[in-house]
Amino acid sequence: MLNNHSMMSAIEELIDDVVANDTNATDFPDYDINDSFSHFEWAELAPVLVVYSLTFILGLVGNVIIITSTLCPRLRPLPATPTNVFLGGLATADLLLIIFCIPVKIAKLFSYTWTMGIFLCKVVHYMQSVSAICSVVTLTAMSVERYYAIVHPMRAQYTCTISQARKIVIITWITSFLLGIPMIFTQTHKQVGEKYIAYWCVRDSEAGLLWRFHEVYMLIVVLILPLSIMAFCYATICWEIWRVMKRRYHMTSRHALSPNSVDTESIPMTQRQSGNERKSRRDENDDELRTIKQVVKMLVAVVVLFAICWAPMLIDNVLTAYGCLPRLKNGTHKHLNTVFQLMAYFNRWT
């Protein structure tokens, strides 16, 4: 029989099935499902349970509010804009994961085995993969939309429309369902134990090449390729904003250095009105520029947060698949592995 430490390490590994860390069934021929229920490490389970619970409650409420605020015509307090349409699609992707996956994972915290059959084993992880892909593709589409709206405003008048945004959201969902298909083949419903039969829902390490390909594939699709596009779009946007601000600064400086010793009473009324109109237009332009900067900052913050939350787990998956990190996490590796997964779920309600 496994000792408590090795059993809890294996069990914790399987609880964290988001990461590709599984073990061969023959490694645990004496696995006893009844005996495993008598070992609860609350110091390790409690933080995971708290974060999953907060993710479900806050994510459910927050994403429903965003969806109703951006996509529901009768309840929509926010203006109908392409950016808000994308935000609604992003919230829908996160809500999908929360409804279909979080309750299942909370149940797994206390079962240590998979009792819901092979269908849900594959569907739950497939929907999680679809949600992650849909989120990052939507974020990428938002960055491209902002790029056209700010760098190419004339072209954006007929490309960055609400109808176009809705079409892109639909295409994003279809693409995400297709790109998530490899997860179905890498997740396996594995029988463990000989005297006491149980099942685990883990990555199929026996298909080593497929497993490694899938982890690299997810790293490229979810992180590297989208972030490259986002980095280009936002770098170009920042450069354009800096260029516009610099030009306006020089125009204002030249206006301030112009002769001003003339008594204002000697200036004709029509010129005074013209000066007031220019000042009013300048104030409107400044307000518009501040709004653009706020929107860009918000979108950049969303992208940076997504990268920080997902990169550690995706990189850990690849290193584990290629044998650079142990499949069974013990000590520091186990705690870091748990933190990486909690970071990924934290992204769902931030």
Where do the protein language model's features map onto the residues?
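Extracellular N-terminal segment of 7TM GPCRs
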Residues: 1-61
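Loop architecture of class A 7-transmembrane GPCRs
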Residues: 28-39, 109-133, 152, 157-166, ...
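Generic alpha-helical transmembrane segments of integral inner-membrane proteins
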Residues: 50-53, 57, 61-64, 99, ...
